[in-house]
Amino acid sequence: MDKFIDLNADTGEASTPDWAASEAAIMDYISSANIACGGHAGDMETMVDTARRAQESGVSIGAHPSYPDRKNFGRLELTLGEDIDPKILSESLYEQIARLMDAAKGEVKYVKPHGALYNQAVKAKPLAALIGDVILRVDSSLSWLGGPSSEMTQAAQERGLSFIGEGFIDRQYSEDGHLVARALDGAVIRDQEARLAQALSLAKTKHVTSRAGQKISIEAGSLCVHGDSAGAVETARVTRDALIEAGFDIRAFA
C-alpha cells in the first residue's frame, strides 16, 4: 500500500538574518510551506520572496493567517465579540489570504490558521465557523489544515471544504488531544531525538504520548515543525530521512 505524508513548516515570519536563513534552508526538506500573511508577521515583500522560494523548491503554498496582532505575534488569545469584532476579524483574515494569493500569483493551495487563532478554533465553534466562512468566501477549492477531531474539522465538513488533520513534531499534547499551552514548562519539545520519536509515532501509529504519559490518537495527514524553534532545519531533515526510510513518500496534500 502506498504510504505518504506531508511535512509542513511555518515560514515568512523571520525577524532576524539567522531566522531567515533557517526558513530558506528548511524548504529543502518540507512539502508544504505555511506563509505568514501580515497578521502576525510578514509583508508583501516577504510573501513574494517566500512564495517564490517555495515554488522553486517544489513546495506547496499555504496561507497562514492570524489575529491582526503583530505585537504579540498572534499568540495572544482574543475573545470573539469582546476583544475583537467578528466582522473585523473576518475582513482581516480575508485580506490576509487574498494578499498572499496575489503575492503567490494564485498558487495558494490551503489555509492553516496561526497561533492563538488556531488553538482557540480547535475548541470554539463560532470561531471555527468564521474561519470556514472566510475560506469559502476566498476560494472554496482551498484545503484547510488544522487540528484533527476539532471544531475546525466539523466546520470544514459542514461547508464541504477539504480538511487535513495536522500533528506537531515539536509540541507536547494534553490528554484531550490538543496542544499544551506554550507557557507551560516543556510544552515545546527541544530534544531532537524526542521530536523524531514523536514524528515517527504520529506517522506510523497515529498516536502520541501525552504530557501525562497517556497514549492518545492523532489522525494526522501532515506533520508540522515550527520554523522559529531552535534546530528546526535539522528536525525537518532527520524527520524526512527517517520517514522515507520507513517507507513513506513525502508529498504535499494539496
Annotate each predicted stretch with a short phrase.
Residues 10, 64, 111, 225:
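Conserved, mostly hydrophobic/aromatic
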Residues 15-47:
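A short alpha/beta connector and helix-capping loop motif
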Residues 19, 33-40, 73-90, 121-125, ...:
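Glycine-rich tight-turn/loop motif centered on a GG-T
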Residues 24-28, 49-62, 102-105:
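Acidic (Asp/Glu)-rich catalytic clusters
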Residues 70-110:
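Glycine/small-residue-rich loop that forms an oxyanion/phosphate-binding "nest" at active or ligand-binding sites
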Residues 105-109, 207-217, 249-254:
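Flexible, glycine/charged-enriched surface loops at secondary-structure junctions
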Residues 142, 236-254:
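C-terminal domain-boundary segment and adjacent tail
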Residues 149-207:
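Active-site rim beta-loop-alpha module in soluble metabolic enzymes
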